[in-house]
Amino acid sequence: VTKPVAADAWRYPYLWHRQHGDGETEGRKTRPVAFVAVLPGKAGGTNLFILAITSTQPGRDRIAVRVPEIERRRAGLDPIPLWVIVDEYNHDILESPAYFEPGARIGAFSPSFHKKVISAFIAAVRAGQSKAIPRAD
């Protein structure tokens, strides 16, 4: 099984913060996501920090990074306007079996675009503006 690395784009059943707040535990559909960070955990396991990619233009109250056309192609995404949402994220553990299917990797962003996304994500986290949605059991 291919393991995700930072800057990868995969298909994943992302659980939105509003859905989590309503008591849902499963993402309603598989969507493109970006792995903003893949880090070893203190207790073992691999921590995954997963950002949703959406074609719905974010409102002014959301924090997002628009995906340029060249990056959409690199990541294997649809040729339509897309945004990476950085004000919420799914936190999952790679070794928890639930959500990763073979062949789910669709591409990867360039190092320069990934740096832009991770910078926006870190800024949102530090400002207390990015909400974690835990996915691991």
Regions found by a protein language model. Give the residues of each.
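C-terminal terminal-subdomain/extension
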Residues: 2, 67-137
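Generic short beta-strand segments
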Residues: 11-18
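Pocket-edge structural micro-motifs
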Residues: 14, 52, 86-88
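Compact nucleic-acid interaction/catalytic patches
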Residues: 20-30, 36-73
